[in-house]
Amino acid sequence: MQLAEHATDHVLTPAEVRVLRMIAEGNANKEIAAQLSVSEDTVKGQVGNILSKLGANDRTHAARIGLKRGIIEI
């Protein structure tokens, strides 16, 4: 089980890891988009990918998974 759990850690792209870190810091999609100079739709797509790849129910759950697995630090 642990191997399968950690196998997903490397599935996130560098851009998705950056967005996940910003989510964990409390940023909304609009704020993330402005800081990264991308569209809000791009961020929404990345958030959707993050949730799917991590098996998270929502943004907060994704941040908790990311922190627990060591994908991100804040």
Spans of features found by a protein language model:
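Eukaryotic protein kinase
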Residues: 7-8, 43, 73
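Hydrophobic transmembrane alpha-helix bundles
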Residues: 35-37, 71-74
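Regulatory hinge/linker segments at domain boundaries
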Residues: 1-22
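Residue cluster at the C-terminal edge of the helix-turn-helix DNA-binding motif
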Residues: 18, 22, 30, 52-57, ...
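Short alpha-helical segment immediately N-terminal to, or the first helix within
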Residues: 20-25, 36
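Recognition helix of helix-turn-helix DNA-binding domains
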Residues: 28-61
